[in-house]
Amino acid sequence: MIFFWKFFFVQIDKYDFNNLNFRHIDFTNYKKIRGLIFKENLFKINNYHVNSFEFLNFSKNLGGKVGINVSKKNIFNWFKINKYKLYFLWSSELTARRLINILYNYEFINSSLEKKESNRLKEIILFHIKRLLLEFNNLKYYDVDSYQLKAFVLSSIILKKDFTKVLFIVKKIISYQIDNIGMHKSYNILEHSKFINNLKELKNIILFYNIKNGDFLDEALGKLGLVLNQY
């Protein structure tokens, strides 16, 4: 997939990260995160729930200063030690998951941050967007999962991109993910369900921002739903 945008993050305040929580169904594994969340150096643990920032969903449920401090400390420290690493931590898949989890919890985390901390959080988000789009450019349509696709769309919203090309790419990627009878090509019912959930979130994003020509999502959801109803 050949796709590239030039973007320059020079004025942090011009980017809006509010109202970007479009979560439909929460697939977070809270049971596993519960055993990790209060570890002193959580950010150093080589664990999927840490490296994907899925722990932020648990922190939000904790609420208050405790939840915000857990979120802030581990985002900032994780980024500090991993920013320039090149291995799997910055794969398109993990980058997309982290970006989504930060954006979906942004308003909670940012609610009591000082200006300097808030700017730091924004810089981390923009760094993730940059890394995501650079990786995204090297992927084939069939290599993009629905989380990467959702992160791509959210990034496009933040960067105020023309959605004519964005929707063309979204439609292409979705067509590569579904077979002729409407089954997700993982042929795994859980992944099929997650795919439906992410397409519903994409639909809500498009409706919220009044973006036109997103009807193809209804068609895809209809086919996927018919297959799911057979289980």
Where are these regions (language model features)?
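Extreme N-terminal leader/anchor segments
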Residues: 1-41
